[in-house]
């Protein structure tokens, strides 16, 4: 079945990059992609500082290596997902199967919802570990990176919640079956039927057309007639 469904036009239609770039969902994915870089980038570059007791590096978030790893994995996952879903949005117009479109929208909805929750957990976790961090020369140097990761974790919550809402709206759009009516049902019930072909031996050149349903049924009761023997 080829037609408009789940917020996209008919399959095989020409791709318009200008209108695609102006879509709210596209802008949200780009913003979320930038936010993900702003989270894992500072942690990778400046998130590990020298400890006061030795040359080994420790995580700036209270020395908890799990906090740094969680922030990096969360940011990298969001980075890859934004790129993948952007490519899926580009190809979405070419998907002719309504079932495949539904699966793509459900995947977007499920992933966006899960990542919104993980961003909330990550924001709370990083904030808690930063509040417990003991001030020192290393933490003062990497303080800006830690605060940037926390701030953009919060912004990522908002952007991914917005993506979840947009995916839910697209899922609720579903499929408008009226768009396929002209393809499946033809031009209507009053379509004229062609007459007999020439040389078939049947006279008459007029075409037959089904009459409109305006006739009334004869509701008068007929009397009982005695059969003749």
Curated annotation (Swiss-Prot):
Tissue distribution of the protein: Specifically expressed in brain. Found in the brain across the dorsal and ventral corpus striatum as well as in the cortex.
GO process terms (BP): positive regulation of transporter activity; regulated exocytosis; regulation of synaptic vesicle priming
PROSITE patterns (alphabetical): MARVEL
Keyword Transmembrane helix attached: yes
Keyword Cell inner membrane applies: no
Residues of the MARVEL domain: 20-172
Compositional bias ranges of the Polar residues kind: 209-223
Pfam family, one: MARVEL
GO cellular component, as recorded: neuromuscular junction; synapse; synaptic vesicle; synaptic vesicle membrane
This protein's UniProt keywords: Acetylation, Cytoplasmic vesicle, Membrane, Synapse, Transmembrane, Transmembrane helix
UniProt feature coiled coil, ranges: none
Positions where N-acetylmethionine occurs in the chain: 1
Disulfide topology: none
Compartments, as annotated in UniProt: Cytoplasmic vesicle, Secretory vesicle, Synaptic vesicle membrane; Synapse
Cross-referenced InterPro entries: Marvel, Synaptogyrin
Ranges that cross the membrane: 30-50, 70-90, 105-125, 148-168
Highest taxon, organism lineage: Eukaryota
UniProt GO molecular function: SH2 domain binding
Chain segments carrying region Disordered: 209-229
Family: Belongs to the synaptogyrin family.
Subunit structure: Interacts (via N-terminus) with SLC6A3 (via N-terminus). May interact with VMAT2.
Function: May play a role in regulated exocytosis. May indirectly regulate the activity of the plasma membrane dopamine transporter SLC6A3 and thereby regulate dopamine transport back from the synaptic cleft into the presynaptic terminal.
Protein name: Synaptogyrin-3
This protein's encoding gene: Syngr3
């Amino acid at each position: 079945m080829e037609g408009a469904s789940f917020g996209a036009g008919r399959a095989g239609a020409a791709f318009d990059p200008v209108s695609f770039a102006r879509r709210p969902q596209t802008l949200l994915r780009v913003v979320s992609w930038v936010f993900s870089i702003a989270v894992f980038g500072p942690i990778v570059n400046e998130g590990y500082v020298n400890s006061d007791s030795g040359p080994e590096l420790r995580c700036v978030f209270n020395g908890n290596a799990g906090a740094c790893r969680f922030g990096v994995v969360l940011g990298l996952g969001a980075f890859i997902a934004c790129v993948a879903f952007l490519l899926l949005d580009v190809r979405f117009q070419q998907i002719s199967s309504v079932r495949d479109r539904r699966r793509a929208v459900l995947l977007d909805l499920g992933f966006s919802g899960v990542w919104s929750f993980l961003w909330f957990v990550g924001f709370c976790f990083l904030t808690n570990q930063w509040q417990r961090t003991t001030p020192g020369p290393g933490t003062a140097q990497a303080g800006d990176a830690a605060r940037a990761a926390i701030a953009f974790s919060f912004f990522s919550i908002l952007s991914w919640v917005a993506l979840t809402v947009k995916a839910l709206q697209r899922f609720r759009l579903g499929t408008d079956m009226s768009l396929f009516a002209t393809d499946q049902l033809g031009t209507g019930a009053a379509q004229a039927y062609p007459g007999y072909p020439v040389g078939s031996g049947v006279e008459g050149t007029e075409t037959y057309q089904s009459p409109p349903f305006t006739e009334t049924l004869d509701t008068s009761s007929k009397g009982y007639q005695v059969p003749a023997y």
